[in-house]
Amino acid sequence: MSYFPWLTILVVLPIFAGSLIFFLPHKGNKIVRWYTIAICLLEFLIMTYAFCYHFQLEDPLIQLKEDSKWIDVFDFHWRLGIDGLSLGSILLTGFITTLATLAAWPVTRNSQLFYFLMLAMYSGQIGLFSSRDLLLFFIMWELELIPVYLLLSMWGGKRRLYSATKFILYTAGGSIFFLIGVLGMGLYGSNEPGLDLERLINQSYPTTLEILLYFGFLIAYAVKLPIIPLHTWLPDTHGEAHYSTCMLLAGILLKMGAYGLIRVNMELLPHAHYLFSPWLVIIGAVQIIYAASTSLGQRNFKKRIAYSSVSHMGFIIIGIGSITNIGLNGAILQILSHGFIGATLFFLAGTACDRMRLVYLEELGGISIPMPKIFTMFSSFSMASLALPGMSGFVAELVVFFGLITSPKFMLMPKMLITFVMAIGMILTPIYLLSMLRQMFYGYKLFHVPNKNFVDSGPRELFLLICIFLPVIGIGIYPDFVLSLSVDRVEALLSNYYTK
C-alpha cells in the first residue's frame, strides 16, 4: 500500500503547471507548445508509474486512497481513490489529452489561454474519475464546463457562440438536477451531512426517494453521454469546435456521463437501477437506430461523425442496463474503444477541413489523390468505427451483445427483439460511414476549392494517428488487456444485484 499522494499530484499538477503558462516569455507560441506537451507527458508518466507499481489489479477494493479535511465547517473532505472502473478512464484521459495538445499546434491566437484551458480540463477529468466524495465529484463535473465553453466560443467556427451557448445551457440545466440529487443523498438519513461514497454505498432509501434521486442523476448524465432526446448540443458543438477540442469532447467528456451512470446510479442506487434497466436497454437500442439514421441524412461530415458518436453511445447504455458481468465489461470496453476511435475521426475530419475549407459532402470528391495518407487513416478508423473484426469496436460491441443475451433480467422475446434492433443499427453504421468515404475521397477531383494547394499529413499528424491506431488494433486482438482492469471490480459491483 502506498501512502504517497499520487492522485492529488495527478489532479493538481496540470492546472497548477498550466497557470504558469502566462509567465512564459511572449516569443511566438513555440515555448508554450513544448511546455504544455512536457506537462502532459510528465503527468502521463507519473500516472503510468503509479498504476504499474502501486495498484493491484486482483484487488477489487478502492486503492491509492487519500482522505484529508478540506472545508472544516461543512465537514467536506478531499477524498480520492481508484479502482478497476476508473483506472481505464484515467489512462484514456492522459493518453488522449497528451495527443490533443499535440494536435493543437496550429493554434496561434491566444495560445497561452488555449493551452491553459486544455490543462484545466485535464485536471477536472482526472479529478472526476478519482473522486471518492460525491460533492467533490460534482465540483469536478462542473469544472469542465468553463474551459469547454471558452474553447468553443473563442476558437470555434462561424456559429461558435450559438453552439457554445447551447452546450452551456444543456449541461448547466443537467447540473441542477445533479446538485439536487447530491444534496438529497447528503441530507437524507443522518444528522451530519456526509457525501463519502463508502458510506453512501451502504445507505438505503425509501423506494420513491431512490427513484427520484436516480432520475435526477440520470438527466445530468443523459446530457453528457448523451442520451436522446438530450443529444442535440453534440452535433452543433462538434460542427463548430476546433478539432483538438473535439478530441477531448468525443474522447473523454462523453465518457464522464457513462462513468457517472456506473459509479453513482449503479453503485449507490441499485434498487432503482434494477427498475430502470429495461428502459435503459430500450433507449439504447432506439438510440443506435435513430442516431445512425440521422447521421445518414447529414450533409456536414463533422455532424455525420457526431451522430455516429451518439449511435455508439447506445451500446454503452445497453451494456449498463443489462446488469451482467459481460454486459458491463463490454460497456467499459466500448467507453475506451470509442474514446480512441471517436477522437481520431474528429481529428481527421478537422485536419481535412482545415486544408479544403469545405465541410459539405456534396462539394467534396476525389481527395484521395492529393491526400493519400489522410485517406488511408480515415478509411482505417472508419473501419474500426463500423466494428471490423480485429479492431476494438468489434470486440466491444460483440461483448455487449453477449451481455444482453445472457442477462437473466430479460425474457427471451424482448432480448431477441432488442438484439434484432441492435443488429439493424450495426448494418446502418457501414452505410453512413462508407457513403461518407465515397463522397469525400472517391469520384472526380475537386476543382472549385477555396484552397487548392492543400498538402497531405505531416510527420506530427502521422505520429499522432499511429499512436492511437496501435491501441485500437491491440484491444481488438487482445481485449483481455483492458478487461483485466475492470473484471474483478465489476463482479464485486454486480454482487449487490443478486444478493439484495
Swiss-Prot record:
One of its GO terms (molecular function) is ubiquinone binding. GO terms for biological process: aerobic respiration; ATP synthesis coupled electron transport; electron transport coupled proton transport. InterPro entries: NADH_Q_OxRdtase_chain4, NADH_Q_OxRdtase_chainM/4, NADH_UbQ_OxRdtase, ND/Mrp_TM. GO terms for cellular component: chloroplast thylakoid membrane. It is found in: Plastid, Chloroplast thylakoid membrane. Belongs to the complex I subunit 4 family. NCBIfam families: NDH_I_M. This is NAD(P)H-quinone oxidoreductase chain 4, chloroplastic. It comes from Sorghum bicolor.
